[in-house]
Design a protein with these regions (language model features):
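Thiamine diphosphate
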Residues: 73, 77-80, 85-191
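Glycine-rich beta-alpha junction loops
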Residues: 31-32, 140-141, 202-206
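Beta-sheet entry/capping signal
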Residues: 24, 103, 132, 196-198
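Generic structural signal for well-ordered, non-membrane alpha-helical segments
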Residues: 29, 33, 47, 84, ...
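Cofactor-binding active-site loop characterized by glycine-rich and histidine/acidic residues
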Residues: 2-127
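Glycine/aspartate-rich loop-and-adjacent alpha/beta segment that forms the canonical ThDP
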Residues: 177, 181-242
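Short secondary-structure boundary/capping segments
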Residues: 43, 151, 213-217
Length: 242
């Protein structure tokens, strides 16, 4: 998300819900809202100080993003897993009907691909050549109940999307922000060639923090003060250039 908002997407100065003549981003796995809100604030959509209200009573920053409070940068209520593909595809179709040279981006968790609605949209997008669409899969093999392969193994995602007719890009170093920028630029340059694009981004949950790496147990758990200090010391600022 950092790379998309700071380096890739064409964005208008003022936020509007319809996003006319600009690129759009939709977050499907809405439970990663802290990351989304942080990026939006640092991209000028609302004051950074508002991040301190996260999940508090009457805050605009709830656990799952919602349009109810009119938070700039949020266009859909997300977190009902599996709906993001359908929303992004619909927005991409709208851009094409309006003859805009704009791209729709979306982010999805690998676990939510277990929802059948995804695959109806994936099939539709390829069959109808929705080629102004770039979808990224956060492929970390973790979901709330455990490892993806143990809960419901999705097999080889590259082969699946290829079979459905998508242009498939793979990134092994999904935690390397420079590599992320390269693959997103590659995807952007491949748009408008009669195929939707998917990036299978292999990542590690909790990367850089020794007690959070490689486990699903931090999926919905907040660190205490001691754990927070330790995590911040192990994982210092890495995006200052963005």
């Amino acid at each position: 998300m950092v790379v998309l908002y700071q380096k890739i997407m064409k964005r208008n100065k003022d936020f509007t819900m319809d996003g006319e003549n600009e690129d759009l981003f939709f977050l499907s796995n809405g439970h990663i809202s802290p990351v989304f809100y942080s990026v939006l604030a640092r991209s000028g959509y609302f004051p950074i100080s508002e991040l301190q209200t996260f999940r508090k009573i009457n805050s605009r920053l709830q656990g799952h993003p919602t349009t109810h409070e009119g938070l700039p940068g949020v266009r859909i209520a997300s977190g009902s897993l599996g709906q993001g593909f359908s929303v992004a595809i619909g927005a991409a179709i709208s851009k094409k009907l309006n003859k805009e040279n704009s791209i729709v981006y979306s982010l999805h968790g690998d676990g939510e691909l277990q929802e059948g609605q995804n695959w109806e949209g994936i099939m539709y997008a390829a069959a109808n050549k929705i080629d102004n669409l770039v979808c990224t899969i956060d492929n970390n093999n973790k979901q709330i109940d455990g490892d993806l392969k143990d809960v419901l193994d999705m097999g080889n995602l590259e082969e699946k999307f290829d079979a459905f007719g998508w242009k498939v890009l793979s990134l092994e170093k999904g935690n390397d922000i420079e590599e992320v920028e390269k693959v997103l630029n590659e995807a952007k340059n491949l748009c408008f060639n009669e195929k939707p694009i998917v990036i299978i981004m292999n990542t590690e949950m909790g990367n850089g923090v020794d007690f959070m790496m490689g486990t699903h147990k931090w999926h919905g758990v907040a660190p205490n003060d001691e754990q927070l200090e330790k995590a911040l010391n192990q994982n210092p600022e890495t995006i200052k250039d963005y």
